[in-house]
């Protein structure tokens, strides 16, 4: 069954019977992430050994925009993506993304990113690395309409902790490639979120700070009633921090 998503400028709809996304009536082709590609980051090894490795865990639709907005996105070096994560368990864990960091942009600060939840519920598990140490771990809970900024120097994993399909969008600089190796080398994030609601420390990190849990922050300049795509095409200057993370500290609440 096809359902309309809450985007006012660009028409987006989703058919959960075939995991298809439609943009202005067209059906873009996604990149997919299969279970076998998450081998290094799944906690439950017994589950992984028995599960079909070609099962698709999530769908990534990169660089979506209306034709008339092509110059705006290219000129600003920004990309708009949609990610769809159907509900599933990975043995002991909820379904999750592989996890990645962003490379340094300038002044010892990595590129930032901003997400919006269009359907379902998301847990964004953020961790800050300083050398070989993790100095902060934060779980941000977000629901439909919430927008979450990934600050400079934080890696992140997205978790779908519900029985609904998680559909989220993001705006990000198009000037870099994400860095996945640190997560793979340590068998995932600093903490694993288990399907019983508990969290387990990842012993591959050694000493870890306590996990902090917060709800998505409300910011006046990111109104819930306006979707991320519309915000960008109407006020692209708001998103300079995506290419220049030094602007992040100037953002108001």
Range-by-range predicted roles:
Residues 2-142, 160-253:
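Active-site region of the double-stranded beta-helix
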């Amino acid at each position: 069954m096809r359902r309309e998503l809450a985007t006012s400028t660009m028409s987006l709809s989703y058919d959960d019977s075939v995991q298809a996304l439609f943009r202005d009536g067209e059906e873009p082709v996604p990149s997919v992430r299969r279970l076998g590609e998450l081998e290094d980051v799944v906690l439950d090894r017994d589950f992984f050994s028995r599960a079909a490795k070609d099962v698709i865990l999530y769908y990534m639709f990169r660089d979506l925009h209306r034709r008339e907005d092509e110059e705006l996105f290219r000129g600003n070096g920004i990309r708009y993506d949609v990610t769809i994560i159907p509900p599933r368990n990975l043995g002991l864990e909820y379904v999750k993304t592989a996890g990645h960091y962003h490379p340094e942009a300038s002044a010892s600060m990595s590129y930032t990113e901003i997400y919006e939840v269009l359907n379902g519920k998301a847990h964004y598990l953020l961790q800050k690395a300083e050398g070989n140490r993790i100095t902060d771990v934060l779980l941000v809970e977000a629901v439909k309409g919430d927008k979450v900024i990934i600050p400079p120097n934080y890696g992140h994993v997205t978790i779908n902790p519900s029985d609904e399909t998680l559909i989220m969008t993001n705006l990000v600089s198009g000037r870099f490639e994400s860095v996945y190796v640190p997560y793979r080398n340590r068998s995932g994030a600093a903490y694993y979120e288990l399907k019983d609601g508990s969290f387990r420390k990842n012993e591959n990190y050694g000493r870890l700070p306590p996990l902090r849990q917060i709800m998505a922050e409300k910011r006046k300049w990111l109104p819930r009633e306006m979707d991320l795509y519309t915000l960008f095409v109407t006020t692209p200057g708001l998103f300079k921090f995506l290419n220049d993370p030094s602007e992040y500290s100037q953002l108001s609440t």
